[in-house]
Regions:
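Catalytic-core region of carbohydrate-active enzymes that cleave or remodel glycosidic bonds
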Residues: 223-238, 242-326
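Generic structural signal for beta-strand residues in well-ordered domains
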Residues: 24, 33, 166-168, 199, ...
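Bacterial Sec-dependent N-terminal signal peptides
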Residues: 1-22
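Aromatic- and carboxylate-lined catalytic core of secreted/periplasmic carbohydrate-active enzymes
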Residues: 46, 269-273, 280-284, 296-432, ...
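Short beta-strand segments
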Residues: 176-178, 207-210, 230, 274-277, ...
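Active-site mouth of glycoside hydrolases
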Residues: 22-240, 245, 251, 255-256
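Short hydrophobic alpha-helix segments
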Residues: 51, 432-434
């Protein structure tokens, strides 16, 4: 415990120096949807690759020093978005014993002189994130609270007015309506909340966080307040859905999160899409029963690369201990045993940055998902290969290290250079130069789950991989 306290203190010193010397992403302008409606960018055209961590209970469970430490570790690991539950109760209570709603949905006297209130702490967290170039994805209120009647339409209008006026001028806000709920439950409340915020805050993007194995486009693709779609591929493994007819995909495809991206990008109007809640590292398969086994770092890598290569504009990672901020004195959920600050050392948390590094090394807006790059069998379940390409580059994700036949004619250039890229440590190894035809590739390590690699192919003269070296 003494070690973690020292780290928190040292982090606070570092962040002061960092905030004085760093350039921030919003200096490129606010976020907006790209011209091709597939990605996010800043208003000056700079690409934005969303790499999110799930910090659901950050506002409720961490004190100021702990919040600073956590956000610094997120920055160091390459995350540029943290998703939080703005309130997880009506009212919610934070580390300091302060209520989010001392007067219910009347926020006229929320700023009480001499009291470091709930929203003062929220301000602190948002500003601490901003000092590190991190956006806060604010789930305004968790869906179960609305479902149980804790906020009606008029209260949603009052709450949305309060939130929008308080945070419209912060540069690092992304609004998230919903919160693990079907969009056809209390739809009138969600529309009121979203439209109220948007009527006041016209600068920040907005989405809807849906229930597991569903997609926001099912209910809101035509909604004027929705800027991009989000799906929750959820925490179940193949065969665990039990014929749930409310889910978007059929039983037996539960882990195929790439299918949600494909489905969303086929909708019109076309909107960018992201997996806002895939299986978390160290959470039980199926979510609730530890006896079912736990998801590991290789699993969270698979979800990330499958989704992004299938067309998602970014990805959100999660860890069971981190999202609930498990620490001494807190009752664990979902079979968690590791403390949150120890979980920051886990491999999945630290490997996500290699995906962002990879995608940003290549021309961003021309990238498309293209399974025709695979000349052989696409594969099913864990054997599924996922290909994405630009005009003169191609990336193919292979989760099992199996042989694969790739059509090099799908990108420009008479000759192609090839590399293996490791999602585990970002190591790059040159394979060789090839003519434009179908070639067979297989990485080292054998054919087994978790021996995952990205095959990189470029037009011979291109120097894109220099950014990865």
């Amino acid at each position: 415990m003494k070690k973690i306290l020292f780290c928190i203190w040292f982090t606070c010193i570092l962040c002061q120096a960092y905030s004085q010397s760093c350039s921030f992403p919003w200096e490129n302008g606010p976020l907006q949807v790209s011209e091709n409606s597939r990605y996010l960018q800043h208003t000056n055209g700079t690409p934005f690759f969303w790499l999110g961590d799930t910090g659901w209970l950050l506002p409720e469970r961490l004190n100021r020093d702990e919040a600073e430490y956590y956000l610094e570790q997120c920055k160091q690991a390459g995350f540029n978005v943290v998703q939080v539950q703005t309130i997880n109760g009506v009212p919610a209570m934070n580390f300091y014993g302060q209520s989010s709603m001392p007067d219910g949905f009347d926020f006229s006297n929320i700023n009480r002189p001499g009291i470091y209130g709930y929203w003062d702490h929220m301000d602190f967290i948002i500003d601490a994130a901003a000092r590190r170039g991190i956006y806060i994805g604010m789930v305004c209120i968790w869906g179960g609270l609305v479902k149980s009647g804790k906020m009606n339409v008029e209260e949603a209008k009052a709450y949305g007015t309060f939130l929008a006026n308080r945070y419209k001028d912060r540069p690092n806000i992304i609004w998230m309506i919903g919160g693990d709920i079907y969009g056809n439950i209390k739809t009138e409340v969600w529309n009121m909340l979203a439209n109220t915020i948007k009527s006041i805050d016209k600068s920040h993007l907005m989405t809807f966080h849906p229930f597991g194995r569903t997609l926001s486009a099912e209910w809101f693709n035509d909604a004027p307040w929705l800027d991009f779609n989000m799906f929750q591929s959820g925490h179940r493994r193949y065969g665990q859905s039990k014929d749930d007819k409310k889910t978007l995909l059929p039983q037996g495809t539960e882990e195929d999160n790439w299918r949600y991206a494909e489905h969303s990008l086929a909708q019109r109007p076309l909107r960018p899409v992201i997996d806002g809640e895939p299986s978390y590292e160290a959470i039980p398969q199926g979510l609730h029963d530890p006896k079912e086994g736990f998801w590991k770092d290789n699993d969270v890598r698979r979800y990330a690369y499958w989704s992004v290569f299938a067309g998602s504009f970014g990805h959100t990672y999660g860890h069971s201990s981190i999202m609930q901020f498990l620490k001494p004195g807190v009752n664990p959920a979902y079979g968690a045993t590791k403390l949150w600050y120890e979980a920051l050392k886990d491999p999945g948390f630290n490997q996500m940055q290699y995906l962002k590094k990879l995608i940003l090394a290549f021309p961003f807006f021309e990238r498309v998902a293209d399974q025709s790059c695979i000349a052989g069998d696409n594969g099913t379940k864990y054997e599924r290969l996922i290909a994405t390409r630009g005009n003169d580059y191609m990336l193919v994700y292979n989760y099992t290290g199996r042989p694969m036949q790739i059509d090099l004619n799908k990108i420009h250039g008479k000759t192609k250079k090839a590399w293996w890229y490791s999602p585990r440590n970002a190591e790059l190894s040159y394979i060789g130069e090839f003519s434009s035809k179908v070639e067979t590739f297989q990485p080292e390590g054998g054919h087994l789950n978790g021996n995952d690699w990205v095959l990189i192919l470029t037009d011979g003269p291109r120097k894109y991989v220099e950014a990865l070296q």
